Swiss-Prot record:
Gene responsible for this protein: C9orf163
UniProt-recorded name of the protein: Uncharacterized protein C9orf163
Region Disordered, annotated ranges: 174-203
Species for this entry: Homo sapiens (Human)
Length: 203
């Protein structure tokens, strides 16, 4: 079984790594508090028909492309429960990743998974905390060999997309939570050809 931060051949390629990672987090059993209603409201009409969501669904079934530019608002988390999120390749738009990781943005992760994140991304903003909030896209940074500089939440309930480092640049420490606007030199502008994640327009 693949590890939580590996990408099998079936899932490799732009637009699919995030979908595979969702399933990985499910296997890790470390996902809690998925805001299903928020996700359902962001499904396209076609996706709603395909997924046959009705009323309050226990967990979102499909992601959607990022429409808003750069920032995704996330509601407060609900009660603890294991996430049953899953995707198929057809649910993830081709091209740069722009939808699948929205399903877990702002979700709380337990310490056991946070240790994996620390190994992959860097020090946690609050390593002593039993539960730490952080964007899922931070954990996605090493998929397909990319190393990215990750920004913490600028404030509670908001998700800021990260920017990949230029080739050959070393992984820099996370910006301080007291100074979320801090940026490191050598970052590609959002929307450039080197950007792995959602760029302007979500295409």
């Amino acid at each position: 079984m693949p590890g939580p931060l590996t990408c099998t051949p079936a899932w490799q390629g732009q637009g699919r790594a995030a979908a595979f990672l969702c399933c990985s987090f499910q296997r890790a059993g470390a996902v809690v508090g998925v805001p299903a209603r928020w996700h359902r409201g962001r499904l396209s009409s076609q996706q709603r028909l395909r997924s046959s969501l009705g009323g309050s669904h226990p967990c979102p079934q499909l992601g959607r492309r990022l429409v808003r530019e750069g920032v995704i608002s996330v509601p407060r988390q609900q009660g603890r429960r294991r996430c049953r999120e899953s995707f198929s390749p057809a649910d993830v738009a081709p091209g740069p990743i722009c939808s699948a990781n929205i399903c877990l943005s702002g979700v709380r992760f337990l310490t056991c998974l946070n240790r994996v994140r620390e190994h992959v991304v860097g020090p946690s903003p609050s390593p002593a905390a039993p539960i730490c909030f952080f964007p899922v896209v931070e954990a996605l940074c090493t998929l397909r060999g990319r190393r990215c500089h990750c920004l913490p939440f600028p404030k509670r309930g908001m998700q800021r997309w990260m920017l990949p480092l230029r080739r050959g640049a070393r992984l820099l420490p996370l910006a301080s939570s007291k100074n979320p606007r801090a940026r490191s030199p050598g970052l590609d502008p959002l929307g450039s050809s080197e950007t792995l994640w959602s760029h302007r327009g979500g295409h």
